[in-house]
Regions:
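Alpha-helical transmembrane segments of multi-pass membrane proteins
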Residues: 15-26
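Hydrophobic alpha-helical transmembrane segments
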Residues: 53, 57-60
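Flexible extramembrane linkers and terminal tails adjacent to transmembrane helices
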Residues: 1-11, 25-40, 61-139, 144-225, ...
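Interfacial helix-start motif at the membrane-water boundary
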Residues: 39-53
Length: 262
């Protein structure tokens, strides 16, 4: 797909509003904070999260689509798994530049309950806060992008070619592809996400300092299991998100840009 269609598809997804409660519960669990069932609390920071998901997904689709075009260089063939994954990793890393500050706003709103404007003012009072947690975000997004942009198409194609009777079309193969992509994206990236979330929830640096200091603190408090706090909520959200976005990529993409799927 070309650059512009990829950007358009990146903006068109409804999953952030549907899955915000999963995101809230995951963030609170990672920081060892109580979970509220009040929808007004669960949806704190949803505006920043919507912008985050829209902009990051747009960047990932656009950069990933352009890189795949460059790799193919006009050839009519499928990308290899390595080529798919390399494109996803690069696209995800770039998207972290936008995603990290926006997630910081969301997490601070969830922790403090301030308005959007007050939260931005609180963060920018110390400019060093703006990119707090970027390393964790960049690594997580790099691997996550592989999980939803790179792995599902390869898995779907492999299942349909290897087991054509069981998986005769994309619709049948999509569910196992989403489960595998979500599993890869969740458990491989979750330790980085936990470190990032703890750092962004503590901009005052009372408990968590740098990336390495935060990782050491989590390990000393809870051993390796501390890095997987909130993983159940995240995996549930990711499987739903991968399914929605893989479906959207195919159905909406084909409707808007049929020539790209010829």
């Amino acid at each position: 797909m070309s650059f512009c269609p990829s950007m358009c598809l990146g903006c068109l997804h409804p999953q952030v509003l549907l899955l915000q409660p999963f995101n809230y519960a995951k963030n609170m669990t990672q920081q060892k904070q109580p979970i509220s069932l009040n929808p007004l609390v669960m949806y704190r920071g949803v505006h920043a999260n919507a912008v985050n998901m829209g902009s990051c997904t747009m960047i990932q689709f656009a950069v990933g689509g352009r890189l795949k075009q460059m790799i193919l260089n006009g050839e009519s063939r499928h990308l290899s798994l390595g080529e798919e994954m390399a494109s996803g990793i690069a696209a995800g890393t770039v998207s972290g530049l936008a995603g990290s500050p926006l997630e910081l706003i969301m997490i601070q709103q969830q922790r403090k309950g301030l308005s959007l404007g007050a939260t931005i003012g609180d963060i920018t009072a110390k400019p060093a806060n703006i990119m707090r947690g970027f390393v964790g975000c960049a690594v997580r997004e790099a691997l996550w992008t592989c999980g939803y942009l790179s792995i599902p198409p390869v898995v779907r194609r492999t299942l349909m070619e290897t087991y054509p009777d069981t998986f005769p079309d994309n619709n049948r193969a999509r569910i196992p592809a989403a489960l595998l992509g979500g599993l890869f994206a969740c458990y491989l990236t979750h330790p980085f996400d936990t470190v990032k979330t703890c750092m962004q929830g503590d901009i005052e640096r009372k408990i968590y300092g740098t990336f390495s200091q935060t990782a050491a603190k989590i390990f000393s408090d809870s051993s390796i299991f501390g890095f997987y706090r909130g993983a159940t909520f995240r995996y549930g959200r990711m499987c739903c998100a991968v399914f929605i976005m893989d479906l959207l990529k195919e159905k909406v993409g084909y409707a808007l840009y049929p020539e790209a799927f010829a």
